[in-house]
Amino acid sequence: MPALTSTKNKTKDLTHGPIGRQLFWFSLPLFAGSLIQQFYSTVDLIFVGRVLGKDAAAAVGASTFIIIIILGFFIGLSVGIGVIAAREFARGEFENLSRVVHCTAGLTIIFSIVFTILGIIFAPSVLELMNTPPEIMHWGTVYIRLFMLSLFSIVSYNVGSGILRALGNSLSPMIYQLIGGIANVIGNFLFVYYWNFGISGSAMATVVSQTLAAGLVIYHLYNMDARYCLRFKKITLDLPLAREIFRIGIPAAIQTIVITLSNIVVQTNINGLGVNSIAAYAAYFKVENVIYLPIMALGQACSTFISQNVGVGKIMRSKRGTAISIYFGLAVTAVSISLVLFFADFAFGMFTDDAEVIAIGSSIAFVIMPFYFLYVFLEVLASSIRGSGSTLPTMFIILVNMCVIRIGVLKLIMYFNPTADGVAWVYPITWVFTVACLYWYYRSERWNPVKVLAKPAV
């Protein structure tokens, strides 16, 4: 079967060619794109923290998990969409691929409207449940409500980019996100610093930048290969296809939401430690991206690689791709951990001038980051299993380990050592259990459709 490569659309068949080189070059734009996407919120936090103070920065940090849990649903659906799109592309089934594109557009429109309304209505209630301090409650509510106005754009960009990645194109989404990132910096300067719109200006800058990036992705989808390009008159809810997307995507969505819910429980306990700890953790999660984003990019690349290769029955090539992704991840993580820990005070000083917040943030980093190599195995193995279309087992593994066990460990820590450092130990402890379960499942090959189909009926 010839490689399905289009110069015009930058699509690429990942079922042929040198695996290491393909994963490396495919993951680089993914890393850059994720870095730019996180840059949005990082710039928000820098402007808010420097111009408006640590209370405003804490309000943004306390709002983060609410925003993530809403996006988690769509991220999960995009997994299902990506697996199916990559499979149909690798098989050359372009009519089915067109159905995926247009069903995805219909789902995006409907669910974006519903979640936007719910987010705006229930923002204050959820912040109260999270034990958010009264002094930052108002600004947290304002930030969430304004941010929700960009939900359709954020979802459109991420889902549309997921389709492009499934077709082997990771470069174009990165370029569009870069353009949006530049707009975000300009918007923050104008709305927050120059026009003094406060935390509302930070959210407004995000709305403008995300809308621009989403518009570029939609334009790209509209101008793809005529056999599967987006046409607005074809947008529909293909119920059989939607059920298949939900079959794969809903477990992935639940997995994402479960992780976020468990982190909300963690954040709730952090909120009880005071504004300094809240601000320190908000800054830590930004600093952590230097390590996390390359791992996430490798996971995304591995998932697309697996989806295409499993789709055409190349199981051994899929396994080699998983192993190479882990090797790459360990090498990159070793370097990034060393840099972050060596320059910890400088990194946290980017977000605040408060010496106590910097000290707490650095202490958190020295607890968690030495164990971050575990997250390489977690991300790559989970992405590989999801890429095969087997999302239900990973959901159960994540549910048990990163929700039930994590909350149990947290309760013990808050009883014996209720400090910011104590809370930090929750992450490496639960990573150990999660990686052990994922490794067992991967080695069992229950995800392998060839092996499963070859089993005799009982």
PLM feature spans:
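Short alpha-helical transmembrane segments in multi-pass integral membrane proteins
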Residues: 1-27, 85-150, 194-250, 306-371, ...
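N-terminal transmembrane alpha-helices
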Residues: 14-51, 65-80, 84, 109-116, ...
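Transmembrane helical elements of multi-pass membrane transporters/channels
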Residues: 25-44, 146, 157, 180, ...
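Transmembrane alpha-helix boundary and packing residues in multipass membrane permease domains
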Residues: 30, 34, 46, 83, ...
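Helix-terminus/linker motif at the lipid-water interface of multi-pass membrane proteins
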Residues: 39-57, 127-134, 190-197, 257-290, ...
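Small-residue hotspots at the loop-to-helix junctions and early N-terminal turns
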Residues: 54-65, 144, 203, 275-290, ...
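Small-residue-rich hydrophobic transmembrane alpha-helices
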Residues: 57-117, 154-173, 280-344, 375-398
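Short runs within selected transmembrane alpha-helices of multi-pass transporters and secretion channels
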Residues: 78, 146-165, 173-184, 202-217, ...
